């Protein structure tokens, strides 16, 4: 089993457990150059809020710093944005789905920023 298959296996198990809880899910996906966050409905079929480093506003803010979306500063910004959007959609608490990625670096920065912005998980 290679690295990608192991990550996907971990993600699948996490999503099964979160589905049993029937709560909104904050899913994170990261690539080498970008990071994405989405809040899914408790049934898992609708996206209620989303944020990523591909958004024009985010890219403009990141252009001042490093111009890239693949760093901790970008992940922190996305964490704040997803928390604001989720709260605007009426969601106060979520289950954190790290999609099989280690809770370290950019994933950790996004989670901590979302918590600081008022999202509970």
Swiss-Prot record:
GO terms for molecular function: 5S rRNA binding; structural constituent of ribosome. GO terms for biological process: translation. Keywords: Ribonucleoprotein, Ribosomal protein, RNA-binding, rRNA-binding. InterPro entries: Ribosomal_uL18_bac-type (IPR004389), Ribosomal_uL18_bac/euk (IPR005484). It comes from the Bacteria. One of its GO terms (cellular component) is cytosolic large ribosomal subunit. Pfam families: Ribosomal_L18p (PF00861). Part of the 50S ribosomal subunit; part of the 5S rRNA/L5/L18/L25 subcomplex. Contacts the 5S and 23S rRNAs. This is one of the proteins that bind and probably mediate the attachment of the 5S RNA into the large ribosomal subunit, where it forms part of the central protuberance. Belongs to the universal ribosomal protein uL18 family. This is Large ribosomal subunit protein uL18. It comes from Burkholderia mallei (strain ATCC 23344). The gene is rplR.
């Amino acid at each position: 089993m290679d690295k990608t298959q192991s990550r996907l296996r971990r993600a699948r198990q996490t999503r099964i457990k979160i589905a049993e809880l029937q709560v909104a899910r904050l899913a994170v996906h990261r690539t080498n150059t970008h990071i994405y966050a989405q809040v899914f409905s408790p049934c898992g079929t609708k996206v209620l809020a989303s944020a990523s480093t591909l958004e024009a506003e985010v890219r403009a803010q990141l252009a001042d710093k490093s111009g890239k979306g693949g760093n901790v500063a970008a992940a922190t910004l996305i964490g704040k944005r997803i928390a604001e959007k989720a709260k605007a959609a009426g969601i106060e608490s979520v289950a954190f789905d790290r999609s099989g990625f280690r809770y370290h670096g950019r994933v950790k920065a996004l989670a901590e920023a979302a918590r600081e912005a008022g999202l509970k998980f």
